[in-house]
Amino acid sequence: MLKSSKKEDSSKKNQNNNLIFTVRKLFSPIKNFFRTTKTPDNFFGVIKRLKINIQKMTLDERNILANLLELEDKTIEDIMVPRSDIVAIKLTANLAELSESIKLEVPHTRTLIYDGTLDNVVGFIHIKDLFKALATKQNGRLKKLIRKHIIAAPSMKLLDLLAKMRRERTHIAIVVDEYGGTDGLVTIEDLIEEIVGRIDDEHDQQLDSDNFKVINNSTIISNARVEVEVLEEIIGEKLKNDDDEFDTIGGLVLTRVSSVPVIGTRIDISENIEIEVTDATPRSLKQVKIRLKNGLHSDKI
């Protein structure tokens, strides 16, 4: 079972308190406006009309306010994890297989469960429920641990989704296309990051600004969501056919494996290319290491 030191717990608590303080400070004039106004405009109209002294705001406060203003027009399609990057577990798996797949030593919290194909997501399992089941030595299938998710269209506004998640008391939305198939995934964390900015933890590995770094003549580190075309241009090799449904390096990996790729999984993409999964969550690939057996041309390094 994972344990955090008191120092780490205290640091995380302080970070959370600072974030809460920033949000409360930023929203206090908005609350006062609603208290004194009988017929307020819509939320974004209120923010735009408020006489907020920008000069007295911290950088974090300015960023949050800017993100809120931009949120008005954003839809699920703008932020969702695409289908090709989703990693999920079959309903027929047992608890032992699930615990092995999500690597309990890495503190991910939720994993999707599907029946038959990814177009039939039946819900998700929270890691604390899995810990409890393993601690009490429960056996069998996953059905009794599954929590509900919600369904949403790509065109739904993010604020509408946030309100729906709150009403339904769930943290995961499956995005469906016009035919009812799974198009993508959005979590409550994705929505929060749209407001407060990206939230990294100690397990996130940082890359350069393009999330694609050539380490040496034979090694590349890449974010799994980098488009395959970027890799093709670097190595001078065609990896994606016109009829392929994936666009990203993560999608390329997922088309070559029959089971959930966990950290350490290695896949031969071609005679020249081997890809190793170096960072992943139960729902998506995050980072890969690309090994080139023939190496790169000197002008590409």
Curated annotation (Swiss-Prot):
InterPro entries: CBS_dom (IPR000644), CBS_dom_sf (IPR046342), FAD-bd_PCMH-like_sf (IPR036318), FAD-bd_PCMH_sub2 (IPR016169), Ion_transp-like_CBS (IPR044751), Transptr-assoc_dom (IPR005170). It comes from the Bacteria. Pfam families: CBS (PF00571), CorC_HlyC (PF03471). GO terms for molecular function: flavin adenine dinucleotide binding. SUPFAM superfamilies: CBS-domain pair (SSF54631), FAD-binding/transporter-associated domain-like (SSF56176). Keywords: CBS domain, Repeat. Transmembrane segments: none annotated. CDD domains: CBS_pair_CorC_HlyC_assoc. Gene3D superfamilies: 3.30.465.10, CBS-domain. GO terms for cellular component: plasma membrane. Residues 80-142, 145-202 form the CBS domain. The keyword Repeat applies. SMART domains: CorC_HlyC. Belongs to the UPF0053 family. Hemolysin C subfamily. It is not know if this bacteria is hemolytic. This is Possible hemolysin C.
